[in-house]
Amino acid sequence: MSWQTYVDEHLMCEIEGHHLSSAAIVGHDGAVWAQSTAFPQFKPEEMTNIIKDFDEPGFLAPIGLFLGPTKYMVIQGEPGAVIRGKKGSGGITVKKTGQALVIGIYDEPMTPGQCNMVVERLGDYLVEQGL
């Protein structure tokens, strides 16, 4: 299965009539493996900061998680495994696997819990596969 198929069929899937606004799978080096059409352009240092927060939990809390034009307030995740962010009625979930970051961005009416479920389910699967 291609990385784009994982994004299209597993991250952008419909959950209770809703789906993520955008999603991507990005390598730890910041290279995009696959992304949805609406996924924001980001700066390399934004991905570097996300990786740094996985290595040093709490790093992003005082500065926020930036991805493209959006700044998310970092909320409780799972140190070293999941980062969650909030911006107005939407937010972001980032799950770290052995080789990649699985990223989902949502807006209402999708809920944070639905976004977490979609992103973490694929991330957990990739971890089980050694990826």
Swiss-Prot record:
Keywords assigned by UniProt, alphabetized: Actin-binding, Allergen, Cytoplasm, Cytoskeleton, Disulfide bond, Phosphoprotein
Major site of localization recorded for this protein: cytoplasm
InterPro entries noted in UniProt: PFN (IPR048278), PFN_euk (IPR005455), PFN_sf (IPR036140), Profilin_CS (IPR027310)
Disulphide bonds in the chain: 13-115
GO biological process, one term: regulation of actin cytoskeleton organization
Xref: Pfam families: Profilin (PF00235)
Motif annotated as Involved in PIP2 interaction, chain positions: 81-97
GO CC terms: cell cortex; cytoskeleton
Modifications the protein undergoes after translation, according to the UniProt entry: Phosphorylated by MAP kinases.
Tissue spec. comment: Pollen specific.
Taxonomic superkingdom: Eukaryota
Annotated SUPFAM superfamilies: Profilin (actin-binding protein) (SSF55770)
Record-listed Phosphothreonine modification sites: 111
Molecular function GO labels: actin monomer binding; proline-rich region binding
Compartments (UniProt record): Cytoplasm, Cytoskeleton
UniProt keyword Nucleotidyltransferase present: no
Protein function: Binds to actin and affects the structure of the cytoskeleton. At high concentrations, profilin prevents the polymerization of actin, whereas it enhances it at low concentrations. By binding to PIP2, it inhibits the formation of IP3 and DG.
Note: The variability of the residues taking part of IgE-binding epitopes might be responsible of the difference in cross-reactivity among olive pollen cultivars, and between distantly related pollen species, leading to a variable range of allergy reactions among atopic patients.
Assembly mode: Occurs in many kinds of cells as a complex with monomeric actin in a 1:1 ratio.
Family: Belongs to the profilin family.
Protein name, as recorded: Profilin-3
Record gene name: PRO3
